[in-house]
């Protein structure tokens, strides 16, 4: 039995002995996706015990945090309207593309613990959705960092994002393209880059806007980030304002007002782009 089959056998045995520990989606991935297992083995230099421990940890986290149980409508329109995460487009090599917009990154560390945890869960949900979409294939994540200020750098939040990616994206095939990184935030960004594992650090490329089309055609990028595509809508159908989502009623209304005030420009862009005059509520 080779290492992949050995790892698969051990994880499936664990799942059988602990039926509530791993989500059925992940059990199916373990059964059918060799690449999923190979990445953990490669990340841990074929140390089967370490790979097994890391993989089981990831699968338990995915289940306990309910990442497979969520859909777009779980999260508030405010988060989508900012346009910080863009799951859209294909690269010049026909790879899946994900965009991150630095100037629209919110700072949630100064808000309530509940808002912080919701924002972190939103990132994890987007991560998982994208992870399943690319299905082991190489991909490109571009970060448009022009006009990004220090108010967009939330070190406490970003460190948790880095820790999550380090733990759950072993031997990643994603290339990170950082575009127009200004000198003001370069120091902070470099601190975060240094926290990434070696494999991820080696996938980072710095570029200015003139190099973007070497990777992604402009018609595969939304107009609001400098592309030419007008078909992308940041706010998915059925998504409502956080103020009227029953499962988010524990977050005070003033917290939502603070999110809107802090990120007003990006949110207004998102509303205009989606053909809306206001954030969708229970009546829209």
Model-found features: residue ranges?
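Basic, amphipathic alpha-helical/coil surface patches used to engage anionic, phosphate-bearing ligands
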Residues: 1-284
């Amino acid at each position: 039995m080779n290492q992949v089959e050995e790892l698969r056998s051990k994880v499936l045995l664990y799942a059988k002995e602990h039926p509530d520990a791993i989500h059925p989606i992940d059990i199916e991935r373990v059964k059918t996706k060799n690449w999923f297992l190979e990445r953990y083995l490669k990340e841990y230099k074929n140390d089967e015990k370490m790979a097994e421990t890391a993989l089981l940890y990831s699968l338990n986290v995915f289940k306990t945090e309910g990442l497979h149980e969520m859909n777009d409508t779980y999260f508030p329109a405010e988060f989508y309207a900012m346009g910080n995460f863009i799951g859209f487009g294909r690269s010049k090599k026909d790879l899946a593309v994900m965009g991150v917009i630095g100037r629209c990154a919110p700072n949630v560390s100064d808000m309530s613990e509940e808002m912080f945890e919701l924002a972190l869960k939103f990132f994890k949900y987007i991560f998982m959705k994208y992870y399943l979409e690319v299905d082991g294939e190489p991909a490109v994540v571009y970060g448009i960092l022009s006009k990004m200020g220090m108010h967009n750098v939330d070190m406490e939040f970003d460190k948790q994002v880095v820790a999550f990616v380090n733990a759950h994206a072993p031997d990643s095939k994603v290339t990170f393209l950082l575009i127009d990184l200004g000198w003001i935030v370069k120091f902070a960004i470099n601190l975060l880059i240094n926290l990434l594992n070696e494999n991820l650090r080696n996938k980072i490329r710095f570029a200015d806007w003139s190099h973007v089309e070497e990777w992604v055609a402009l018609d595969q990028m939304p107009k609001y980030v400098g592309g030419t595509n007008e078909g992308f809508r940041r706010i998915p159908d059925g998504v409502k304002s956080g103020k009227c989502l029953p499962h988010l009623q524990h977050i005070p209304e003033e917290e939502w007002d603070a999110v809107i005030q802090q990120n007003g420009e990006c949110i207004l862009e998102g509303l205009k782009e989606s053909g809306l005059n206001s954030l969708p509520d229970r009546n829209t």
